[in-house]
Amino acid sequence: MHRFFKSEFFNFEFIRILSAAPYGGAEIAECLVAAGQITNDDPESWHRAWIIQADKAKALGDEALHSGDTVSARRAYLRASNYYRASGYMFHDRPGAPDARVLPLAQQVLDTYALTLPLLDTGEASQLKIPFENHQLAAYLYLPRDRTKPVPVLLSLGGADSIQEELYYVYAASGPQLGYAVLTFEGPGQGITLRRDKMHMRPDWEVVVGRVLDFLTAYMQQNPSVQLDLSRVAVVGASMGGYYALRAAADPRIGACVSIDPFYDMWDFVRNHVSPALLNAWNAGWVPSRVVNGIMSMAMAASFQAKWEVGLAMWFFGVDSPTQTLRHMMKYTLARADGTSRLDQVKCPVLVSGATQSLYLEPESDVLRVFDALAHLGDERREIWIARSPEEGGLQAKIGAIGLVVQRTFRFLDQHLNVTR
């Protein structure tokens, strides 16, 4: 496949932005101009290139709206929102390495995206706030315009680095046109809850989704006109969002689950990228944390991708050192301490996918392990899809093949939620 950048990381993230083009989140020429202004592995040039395109698209949206052209305004605002997201993507704002640009850029995404909501032609959209412990989770509810009967609901979960405004370009742009209500939200460690509210990540996503389902029940009672069919609720997520979806699927109120390119055990992921001998010695107490921190700090100094990945994990876990991050990663597993799998609690149909050209995961050690742990469902209620080439969904999270993953997801959901067209 054609490469835009020497860096695998920058190349993947650029394709990620291009992937939003069919759904209004990018314009090809704008992206190519930005690419020409970006220096490989230079986060500052990445930021500058995308902020220029974001500001231009925002100005085009304002101009179109002023002249009454709501179609062009919607398209421009969607692009601007995605470009603002991209402009801040390489930055973190953790206590040990603060960056004052992070929150203002996140707010620009929110403000610009809010301008698109009344202009969307894919259905109705509204902003919600979901009570969760001592906080409120920001959410969007996307509804089909034609709701003569109750509609099934899809909960679209973000992952480690996505924000819910980006999720629009996947399921929220298509779901309402196919007769689904789609709810996106940001839980602990995600999006604005991390950047503004300083909520850090947690592994027990069944608790988070459980509160969301409680909220939807109350919301439906107070707003019956939304016509949500809470007997037909599905959950979908990609990468870490795929892990979250599998955790959430243990809730009996979930009627179907689509887990795109998940991991089974985050610690196994670490062992595939860091010397297992070193990790075992450290975990056994034979090698002190300061030594491991020093080794990982050298790796971060030598590679921007490593610096970004470890820095992001420290940020969303709320810790200050690589070894503290490793301790947190051990908690993110579908295995119980006794060796059994949490997936034995899942009773709903599950579609799980893998990507052989993933930037991060190995399908054989993750997706097949998930699929095998779902054997109790029987082959009629579990499905596996391992994609090998980029156009078939072979990149992580099916980046570059959004239309295909949307088609396969809703085909699976239609079948198991009894949706007919």
From Swiss-Prot:
Pathway: Secondary metabolite biosynthesis
InterPro entries given in the database record: AB_hydrolase_fold, FrsA-like, FrsA_esterase
Family, similarity comment: Belongs to the AB hydrolase superfamily. FUS2 hydrolase family.
Induction remarks: Expression is positively regulated by the oxaleimides biosynthesis cluster-specific transcription factor poxB.
SUPFAM superfamilies per UniProt: alpha/beta-Hydrolases (SSF53474)
Record's keyword annotation contains Hydrolase: yes
The protein's name in its UniProt record: Hydrolyase poxO
GO molecular function: hydrolase activity
Summary of the knockout phenotype: Impairs the productin of oxaleimides and leads to the accumulation of a trans-decalin containing alcohol intermediate.
Transmembrane annotation, as ranges: none
Main function: Hydrolyase; part of the gene cluster that mediates the biosynthesis of oxaleimides, cytotoxic compounds containing an unusual disubstituted succinimide moiety. The first step of the pathway is provided by the HR-PKS poxF that serves in a new mode of collaborative biosynthesis with the PKS-NRPS poxE, by providing the olefin containing amino acid substrate via the synthesis of an ACP-bound dec-4-enoate.
Subunit structure: Homodimer.
